[in-house]
Design a protein with these regions (language model features):
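Extended, charged amphipathic alpha-helical segments
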Residues: 250-398, 444
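Structured, mid-chain assembly/scaffold modules that mediate subunit interfaces
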Residues: 95-258
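Acidic/polar, glycine-anchored loop/turn motif associated with catalytic or activation segments
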Residues: 218, 376, 488
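C-terminal anchoring/interaction modules
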Residues: 2-26, 400, 404, 415-535
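Surface-exposed loop-to-helix/strand elements on domain peripheries
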Residues: 125-128, 341-465
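Charge-rich, acidic-biased intrinsically disordered regions
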Residues: 151-157, 174-191, 312-331, 424-459, ...
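N-terminal-proximal low-complexity accessory segments that begin disordered
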Residues: 1-117
Length: 535
């Protein structure tokens, strides 16, 4: 039977060994003369070391720490901040994210899991309203939520997004501080990435990288934060390093949030700026655009040169012509000739002007500029139309660009809600339960705690080019059963459907009480009439 295999003889074993060696020698031969022009020594052309197109492209392999070390990260952050300040396209990309991802803020709507908690839908709705009111008390007041008492939670959302995109990451501590007139003591303290690092600029360790201390599985344990900015010395304040534990020792609550722009590799401890891949083309494009703008300015200058012959006699000029130039003229303090708007330059005897015509505006500037911006936008996941706010194509093309950009905005919105909004809300619910502001039976159970803390975060609506077409499409999706009124209302208005329908019911009731038409003929169904005699 097959389990009892006959043992090979010595001759057969020698033959099998010879065959194995022969096959190995054949398989190990270099491959030559691949198709497509020019021979290569590898099976994959991208791995070749002899092709001229890739001969000088020999990157190294390294760990996430080596490939994104301290010095490179600091340079990327510095250049990203400078681009945000001075580069038009870079600032447009960041502000476009802030406006469309956060806008006026992500509004929280509690959605407790009533099935897991054993509640009826009516009881769950009452509890949702109670939790929403508590959250509004905290989120709407800067003194409640912000450690600096300057921004409410919705403004903090925008600041967290911008800081993480520009610097790569931002940290949020949650110190407890009692304030007169405040209900809660949980404060949100934003910490810039510059302040998080190894104590006293020390070297990385096996369990400490760039100020992030982690355990054997790579989970963060603590963050090392400087009391100020390294390299900045203020009178009367010395720089010290504080170790902030990520989780509470007794409760296990999250005490420090780490909001990263992107985590692209397992084991990566710090985030890279959003603009990192496009910093080089951004800088070149900014220089090119500035040079073209300056050339156009010079070309627009109208300057008159007065050329004097050898026999020119200044005695024939009136005295006013010999006086000094007034402020704003073309005369400079060092006697140099300068161009100006409508300037008149007096040349010396024998001097002759040489005009260099810059031929501006350059007809090739716009196509080239647009092509480069398209590449930058593709790397940033922003279509050209959305990045430049230039919707000059057809309706279908403009709508496709908006939809593609909206996918990216939705991703960033979900990321912000997961990393900042929802964790900060859970901290507030924890404190509300501890203070007795809300009764949540079984909250100490981790499963029930998650059921109580469930919520949705609703941001500004997507917007539409043709609202009538979008409304008709929404109605059709509801009609054929692929969507519902809750989803469509949130997508089109950014408001919860329950809140919209309650307000609409109040409006219809008010109009009926004043003998006004309740709804247009093409409107939604009106609420049931409890007094048919009125009709």
């Amino acid at each position: 039977m097959w389990p009892f295999r006959k043992r090979d003889s010595a001759a057969e074993q020698l033959m099998n060994e010879a065959i194995r060696v022969a096959r190995a020698s054949v398989d190990g031969q270099p491959i030559v003369a691949q198709g497509g022009g020019g021979g290569v020594e590898t099976r994959w052309r991208g791995a070749s070391r002899v092709l001229r197109s890739v001969a000088s492209w020999i990157p190294g392999l390294g760990s996430p720490r080596r490939d994104f070390n301290h010095s490179e990260r600091r340079m990327l952050v510095a250049r990203s901040r400078d681009a945000m300040r001075n580069h038009l396209i870079a600032r447009a990309a960041i502000t476009r994210l802030r406006t469309n991802v956060v806008g006026t803020g992500l509004v929280c709507r509690a959605q407790v899991d009533h099935d897991a908690l054993g509640l009826t839908e009516e009881e769950a709705e009452q509890l949702n309203g109670q939790l929403d009111r508590l959250w509004s008390l905290y989120a709407d007041d800067p003194r409640e939520c912000d450690a600096e008492a300057s921004l409410n939670h919705y403004q903090l959302q925008a600041l967290v997004l911008v800081s993480s995109m520009v610097a790569g990451d931002v940290f949020v501590a949650s110190p407890d501080q009692e304030r007169p007139g405040c209900i809660f003591s949980t404060r949100l303290q934003l910490i810039e990435s510059d302040r998080v690092g190894n104590p006293n600029g020390g070297m990385d360790r096996a369990d400490l990288v760039e100020g992030v201390e982690f355990d054997g599985l790579g989970a963060p344990v603590a963050y090392h934060v400087c009391t100020g900015y390294p390299g900045e010395h203020l009178l009367g304040k010395s720089l010290q390093w504080e170790r902030l534990a990520v989780f509470g020792a007794e409760t296990g609550r999250r005490r420090v949030l780490h909001v990263m722009a992107d985590k692209e590799r397992p084991g990566q401890k710090r985030g890279a700026p959003y603009l990192s891949p496009v910093l080089e083309p951004l800088q070149k494009l900014e220089r090119y655009s500035s040079a073209e703008l300056m050339a156009a300015v010079i070309s627009a200058m109208f300057t008159v040169f007065i050329k004097k012959s050898d026999g020119f006699n200044t005695n024939n000029l009136p005295m006013s012509a010999l006086t000094e130039e007034q402020a704003g003229g073309d005369d400079t303090s060092d006697g140099a000739i300068a161009l100006g708007e409508g300037a008149i330059v007096d040349l010396g005897v024998g001097e002759e002007p040489m005009i260099a015509n810059p031929s501006r505006p350059n007809a090739q500037f716009d196509p080239f500029f647009t092509a480069v911006v398209k590449e930058i936008g593709a790397a940033l996941e922003l279509p050209l139309e959305e990045l430049l706010l230039h919707y000059s194509s057809s309706y279908s093309a403009a709508r496709a660009a908006m939809l593609q950009a909206w996918r990216f905005y939705s991703l960033r919105r979900w990321w912000l809600a997961c990393d900042f909004c929802q964790p900060s809300r859970e901290l507030v619910i924890d404190e509300a339960v501890a203070r007795g502001l809300v009764d949540l039976p079984g909250y100490n159970d981790p499963a029930k705690r998650k059921a109580y803390c469930q919520a949705i975060w609703i941001g500004p609506a997507r917007g539409a080019i043709d609202e009538l077409k979008e409304a008709n499409a929404a109605g059709k999706r509801i009609e054929i059963g692929v969507s519902n009124e809750t989803l469509e209302t949130a997508a089109m208005t950014g408001e919860p459907w329950q809140q919209v329908i309650r307000q609409r019911t109040r409006e219809v009731t008010y109009r009926r009480e004043h003998n006004m038409q309740a709804l247009p003929k093409s409107g939604l169904e009106s609420p049931p009439d409890h007094n048919p005699k009125e009709e």
